Amino acid sequence: MTYEIVIPVIVSFAISALLGPIVIPFLRRLKVGQTERKELESHLKKNGTPTMGGLMILASIIITSVFYVKDYPKIVPILFMTVGFGVIGFLDDYLKVVLRRSDGLLAWQKMLCQIVVTTVFAVYMGCYSDVPLTMLIPFSGGKYLDLGWGAFPVLYLAVIGTVNGTNFTDGLDGLASSVTIMVATFFSVVAIGTNAGIAPITCAVVGALLGFLLFNVYPASVFMGDTGSLALGGFVVSAAYMMQMPLFIVIVGLIYLVEVLSVIIQVTYFKKTGGKRIFKMAPIHHHFELCGWSETRVVAVFSIITAILCLVAYLGL
């Protein structure tokens, strides 16, 4: 158990923590700072804070996980999805903050890249994996949902939705990191209890995020950027699928879902009503800020909610 759990957490934490003092000054020299939205006056002081810190997270996960690939082959597709979406995020960040192309990847380019990575994962799951695409139904007493070929469109929706959910969640210091630590811990506990064969990478993600949080907690000295947030989305959804638990994302990843829905609702309502808004700002974490909540309070509440939801999900196994 030490080999499977403790070592990945410690090693990935150490790598992430040690990379901080090296990577952050390097990013500052490259002037890869983030530009904050003018509507949030409290965020204007963050202008220029280095982004692309997700490289620290990715490096920690990759370095730790490669030592477990031989004994735990099921971590390979999860590592592929994590790195694959991390690369998409890196390209987006690079275009925005290094090449100063404000839009980064165009919407269709980003979606195409996400579909390509998802397709590789879908082909693996459908043709090469011994993990079926049936889904454990929460609170069903161990019953599984078999959609047949319908599982593939659901997989695409789950991947795209989760990845964009983690992306929208990354809007406050430590928010995406803290929420995903809870989610990764949940998957780690389940993986260990069910001998799912993926515990080393789920534990590595916990350690990597704890190490990154040393520099990302308020006031953050680095942001993960799309490099980190998209990678985390890829991790969450692929880990869930490798344990036949994508339906549990709706529970443990409810914050991701709410963040996405708040944006969809806001944009749709804005267009339908000619400029009216339901929320003061979307994603919804900014709405709470404009309601007077401090940034740290929003992060704490969202993290506590996620922790409670993880306990609820565990009861539903």
Name every feature range the model reports, one short phrase each:
Residues 21-40:
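Membrane-interface helix-loop junction between the first two transmembrane segments
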Residues 72-106, 110-115:
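Hydrophobic alpha-helical hairpins/lids featuring a short glycine-rich hinge
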Residues 1-24, 57-87, 121-128, 148-317:
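Alpha-helical transmembrane segments
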Residues 29-33, 133-136, 273-280:
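Short, Lys/Arg-enriched, Gly/Pro-containing loop segments at transmembrane-helix junctions
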Residues 98, 129-143:
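Membrane-interface helix termini and inter-helical loops of multi-pass transporters
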Residues 47-49, 138-150:
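Short aromatic-rich membrane-water interface segments that cap or initiate transmembrane helices
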Residues 36-50, 100-114, 284-286, 290:
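Juxtamembrane helix-capping/reentrant segments at transmembrane boundaries
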